[in-house]
Amino acid sequence: RTYIIFDVIAKYLKENEGFDVFYLQNITDIDDKIINRAKERKTSPLKLAKYFEKEYLKDMKGLKINSVTKYARATKHIKEIIGQIEKLFKKGFAYRIDDGIYYDISKFKDYGKLSRRTALQAEDAVSRIDESKEKRNKGDFCLWKFSKPGEPSWPFDSSLRSSN
C-alpha cells in the first residue's frame, strides 16, 4: 500500500503539477531479519537479499509501480550512513548502548510533528526490533545495530566506539 501511495503522489506531481520528480527508494539488503532468515535457510544474507529484491521488483512491475527513479541498496551507502549517524552523535541526537546506536527522540522538540504525535506519545510505539531496556526512551529507534560474531560488519569512527 505504501508503495502505491508514493507512486500515485509522484505521478500526480509529475503529470499534473509539472514537477521534475526524483524518487529514490531504499532497498534494505542487510538487517537482523535478513541475517536470521539466511541462517534458517542456510544461505548467505547477500543471496537472500538479492532474491527478495528480485521478487520485490517483479511485484512492483506487476502493480505498474514505475515512478521510482533510482533504487539504493543500503550496503552500497555504508560510508554515507555512518557519516550521518556520526553527525547526529556529535550533535547529541544519538547515543550508544551495548547493541547499537539509537536516536534520542527527546532531543528533537518537533519529533512526531508530521504524525501529530509528541515524543511522549511515541513512547507507546515500541518496535519489536528495538526492545532494548537500555534505551533512554521507549520510542527511541535504532540507527545502527552492532554486528554479532559471524555477521557482516562495518567499522565506525573510533569516537563512536569509545563514547557513551
Pin down the residues of each PLM region.
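NTP-dependent nucleotidyl-transfer catalytic core
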Residues: 1-164
